[in-house]
Amino acid sequence: MNIMDSSPLLASVMKQNAHCGELKYDFSCELYRMSTFSTFPVNVPVSERRLARAGFYYTGVQDKVKCFSCGLVLDNWQPGDNAMEKHKQVYPSCSFVQNMLSLNNLGLSTHSAFSPLVASNLSPSLRSMTLSPSFEQVGYFSGSFSSFPRDPVTTRAAEDLSHLRSKLQNPSMSTEEARLRTSHAWPLMCLWPAEVAKAGLDDLGTADKVACVNCGVKLSNWEPKDNAMSEHRRHFPNCPFVENLMRDQPSFNVSNVTMQTHEARVKTFINWPTRIPVQPEQLADAGFYYVGRNDDVKCFCCDGGLRCWESGDDPWIEHAKWFPRCEYLLRVKGGEFVSQVQARFPHLLWNSSCTTSDKPVDENMDPIIHFEPGESPSEDAIMMNTPVVKAALEMGFSRRLIKQTVQSKILATEENYKTVNDLVSELLTAEDEKREEEKERQFEEVASDDLSLIRKNRMALFQRLTSVLPILGSLLSAKVITELEHDVIKQTTQTPSQARELIDTVLVKGNAAASIFRNCLKDFDPVLYKDLFVEKSMKYVPTEDVSGLPMEEQLRRLQEERTCKVCMDKEVSIVFIPCGHLVVCKECAPSLRKCPICRGTIKGTVRTFLS
């Protein structure tokens, strides 16, 4: 397989740099090895980058990889496998492994330098990655940590070149335009020269090494998803260039002030699912923090949310793709980067509503309609082919869910969604509701027959249940109900009212309460137990008219009926739709997906004000 056919990145590099031609078939180049993994199975539990870093390239067969140096072929990768350790264990005499071990041993000290003697013992491909021996007191930095990594070859090298400051502070390099002119032979396409120059860095003309014209820091070994300004600021936050740039730039409004710092955002990823192929550091760099659910993240500045991360996703590109007007994005990456990303996705250019601060699409503008194969210009087709809906489809939401959500919107308001943000927000809510309904459905499938019988004969039990207190005590002993709930029901004076409160409480508490109810009823009321759980036949006889009761008794019963069946404290005020039950207060209602009395799905609620 020709690398030029499978890697546009390397193809661009080759066109710009004639001296890179030798890398076309050079498996000793990690970048080339990485490009061979374009068709690597996605379900393999070892990352392509770690395999390439360990000297392997993809053979194109299942998950088989081969070392460019010793020819070792490995496959059948398992969770927890370490590519380099496995390489070292199976073929310890491999020259590539030996060279890497030598570099690791050198990288253990806090301050180290590669002497000419050591560097001469390395292979040419590795020697080209080492630091120049003329630079002493070299430190290596990884991510946002100040610790020193074991693998300096594959980690960003950050060198203190303060002793060369007079040379680097050449007035001719003081402008961004001048620094950009030095990048005519810049070897990387994953990092734009304009971005490097904007970060105050000057191309030194050797590999991918750059130096700050102000503080003297030298950075190299750039990785595909690095950001020049972020790396400059992270490793040397006290650099005068960085400080002046941040101070001179006007402040901007942010959605979440507590997530402004990189450190704060990183801390939110403590429970980030390990199966997600995008690393927290990358997401935090791009302004995102973890919301604690699935793989959902949000930008601290524009409040834009992204999810469903896949292997190869670049957080910065996704940020620019969906939220191009984010002020943080524009400040860090620049307008040129955003424009280039948007140009790659022309179908998003119409969308002036990609961020939460954007204005709705002009109602008077004719939408751009693209019909799918087999679709006709029907109302449904037009509804599903608006730019906003197209963007939601591109984000990975199911077409069926989008159609249901849009139809509900049109039925309720007689208009379609005008912004992507509004539609995505509703889709996320709809997905949450579907997940909850699925959980409820599974719960219903395993729900006991006891609970079903109690619910079915609820009204008849109100009339016939007399052994309320023993059952109430058993529920309290089993910690199925709280002392407050116990006391509220116990203080109810009339047995029918106590029975009503008890039965509704059992229905709310679920299977555990139903099981205790059954066992107690068997001991204290065998006749009722037989009718309910054995014969399964109970008849409800409408009660007498309460209008003839004393006013005090009527008020007491009314008060009992008005008590929330969940918290047993506040007054009921929410009617569930469509079942019509009025059994909970406004504080308890939001947590319920199904009516605690009939188990019907709650499609809507109506706030009531009882007088």
Curated annotation (Swiss-Prot):
**Which domain of life does the protein's organism represent?**
Eukaryota
Where it mainly occurs, coarsely classed, is: nucleus
Gene Ontology molecular functions = cysteine-type endopeptidase inhibitor activity involved in apoptotic process; ubiquitin protein ligase activity; zinc ion binding
Q: In which tissues is it expressed?
A: Cells of the T-lymphocyte lineage. Found in both cortical and medullary cells of the thymus. Expressed at relatively high levels also in spleen, bursa, intestine and lung and at very low levels in testis, brain and skeletal muscle.
Its annotated compartments are: Nucleus; Cytoplasm
Q: Which residues pair up as cystines? A: none
GO cellular component term of the entry, any: nucleus
What turns on this gene?
High levels are induced within 4-8 hours of T-cell activation in spleen and thymus.
Zn finger (RING-type) start-end: 564-599
Q: Provide a GO biological process annotation.
A: regulation of cell cycle
Q: Does the keyword Zinc belong to this entry?
A: yes
Reported function: Apoptotic suppressor.
Q: Which family does it belong to?
A: Belongs to the IAP family.
Q: What is known of its domains?
A: The ring finger is important for its antiapoptotic effect.
This one is known as Inhibitor of apoptosis protein
Organism name: Gallus gallus
